[in-house]
Amino acid sequence: MGKKSRVKTQKSGTGATASVSPKETLNLTSELLQKCSSPAPGPGKEWEEYVQIRSLVEKIRKKQKGLSVTFDGKREDYFPDLMKWASENGASVEGFEMVNFKEEGFGLRATRDIKAEELFLWVPRKLLMTVESAKNSVLGPLYSQDRILQAMGNITLAFHLLCERADPNSFWQPYIQTLPSEYDTPLYFEEDEVRDLQSTQAIHDVFSQYKNTARQYAYFYKVIQTHPHANKLPLKDAFTYEDYRWAVSSVMTRQNQIPTEDGSRVTLALIPLWDMCNHTNGLITTGYNLEDDRCECVALRDFRAGEQIYIFYGTRSNAEFVIHSGFFFDNNSHDRVKIKLGVSKSDRLYAMKAEVLARAGIPTSSVFALHYTDPPVSAQLLAFLRVFCMTEEELKEHLLGDNALDRIFTLGNSEYPVSWDNEVRLWTFLEDRASLLLKTYKTTIEEDKSFLRNHDLSVRATMAIKLRLGEKEILEKAVKSAAANREHYRKQMQAGAPLPRCEESGTAGARLPLALRDLEAEASVQEALSLTEAVGRAKAVENGLVNGENSIPNGTRSGKENFNQEGSERATEGTKESSSDSTAGARE
């Protein structure tokens, strides 16, 4: 999968001979599980909790040093075996080769001219590692008994990967040997590198991801040591935190949803070869062909011989890319920052505002997004702000007035203001809110730019600083845009300009409100690949496979959510989750 990290080459060796008492580790993991299962810390206490959890994890890592399974040689040494294995099992291997693109990591390079929309890559089901293949493997007996494995396909895939890696005769060895030895996701950050993310919106998701991963490891360490169905697992004598972090990171950056063989539902999968593709802006061009039972990818654009072949991972923000994929994508046209807004229940007009919002399909409290592109405000956010700033008379017009339903349908349309005064108030409010968010950062835009120019930073520190810089630039842009709109509408109001009115259609019931149309993935919610689309051949469809979809075993949901339910794992190409519960493609 494109842009997945390979910070260093694979270590030599076949595993470790070091010995550590299972009881000693069990005591440490029990302490870790207790710490990670405690209630969420209060405001301002998250960093303290993170440091405490990290301290326990580091103690465990120190005791387990040398116990992890590794492969001899470099990752790229195994590429010929991967291509041979893929070819022998029905995958396409003509027209491209695997190459190290330095900063972008390994990717695919065209060896011939490839036309836009040309089918150039397909991978049959038999090559995929899926939840179904996990059930039919040595992991099957434990899967049948463990509710967390049953509920969280992400974790099942991670253990499937670990078990197959430990088996030198595994069918998937040619694939597993080419996976990165480590990643650039925050799970691998040093403490100082995580500190660079403090005050960013992303930091809460970073803390949550680390805590969830530590809790899962502690829980499953005990399961593997004590559960009778775990006796035959090749992990029994050496299940390290390092191994688990690697496995969940591999899954996090690569997992996708595909239809099951009968097409009745979806399952999670790792897709060899295809997951080497790196990301660029564009459209999703991968899907699943049920007729031929294979994943198929068509070219995003024309690629000439010698050029890198890119795919589009989905509409992910850079926070999602950094947290779940381990890279920062410059000029990300889908970058955004979150802004949480809600109507206070103490508002005298709360009931009326809630009713208007309900008719528009918008909650009274939600996480919206401010965007990198123009306009920075979506139709849904604009509709919310208009209702939020309505007077009692304006609310009555939208509830009881003539053509009230038609008014609801135009709430998200910038061409039809509620009133000039309403526009002035909403843009003033947004300007103030974005300005306040900017003040929460400990550094300025200029300071971040200077720091990037004048310091020799690690890859991870650079990503962290670019991320906080990007957040501030989006907020600053929103402030300027809001200020310009405020002044524009103030002049309209002062001039007594006539208010534009939408042509009354009388057919409102047959239309969807503009605010409800799927104009964007608010709060980074990614669309799922529908079964209908999954059945079709690979085309440049909007909901296809995305490199590195993840609904999180190690994402950013609360501990309870992460342990007790399978976070809406979305269709292929980047199952990113709402409000950072996602995981995207990481650097190769």
UniProtKB/Swiss-Prot annotation:
GO-annotated biological processes: actin modification; peptidyl-histidine methylation; positive regulation of DNA-templated transcription; positive regulation of transcription by RNA polymerase II; regulation of uterine smooth muscle contraction
Keywords: Actin-binding, Cytoplasm, Methyltransferase, Nucleus, Phosphoprotein, S-adenosyl-L-methionine, Transferase, Ubl conjugation
Enzyme Commission number, as recorded: 2.1.1.85
Lipid metabolism keyword on record: no
Region (Disordered) residue spans: 1-25, 546-588
Annotated InterPro entries: Rubisco_LSMT_subst-bd, Rubisco_LSMT_subst-bd_sf, SET_dom, SET_dom_sf, SETD3, SETD3_SET, SETD3_SETD6_MTase
PROSITE patterns (alphabetical): SAM_MT85_SETD3, SET
Binding site for S-adenosyl-L-methionine: R75, E104, G105, F106, R254, D275, M276, C277, N278, H279, S325, G326, F327
Enzyme class, first EC level, given as a word: transferase
Residue ranges, compositional bias (Polar residues): 10-25, 548-566
Disulfide bonds: none
Superkingdom: Eukaryota
Annotated ranges, domain SET: 94-314
Segments of skewed composition (Basic and acidic residues): 567-579
SUPFAM superfamilies: RuBisCo LSMT C-terminal, substrate-binding domain (SSF81822), SET domain (SSF82199)
Catalytic reaction list: L-histidyl-[protein] + S-adenosyl-L-methionine = N(tele)-methyl-L-histidyl-[protein] + S-adenosyl-L-homocysteine + H(+)
Residue ranges the record marks as coiled coil: none
Post-translational modification: Phosphorylated by GSK3B, which is required for recognition by the SCF(FBXW7) complex and subsequent degradation.
Molecular-function GO terms, alphabetical: actin binding; histone H3K36 methyltransferase activity; histone H3K4 methyltransferase activity; protein-L-histidine N-tele-methyltransferase activity; transcription coactivator activity
Functional summary from the UniProt entry: Protein-histidine N-methyltransferase that specifically mediates 3-methylhistidine (tele-methylhistidine) methylation of actin at 'His-73'. Histidine methylation of actin is required for smooth muscle contraction of the laboring uterus during delivery. Does not have protein-lysine N-methyltransferase activity and probably only catalyzes histidine methylation of actin.
Oligomeric form and interacting partners: Interacts with MYOD1.
Domains as described in the record: The SET domain specifically recognizes and binds actin, suggesting that it does not accommodate substrates diverging from actin.
Record family assignment: Belongs to the class V-like SAM-binding methyltransferase superfamily. SETD3 actin-histidine methyltransferase family.
Protein name: Actin-histidine N-methyltransferase
Organism of provenance: Canis lupus familiaris (Dog)
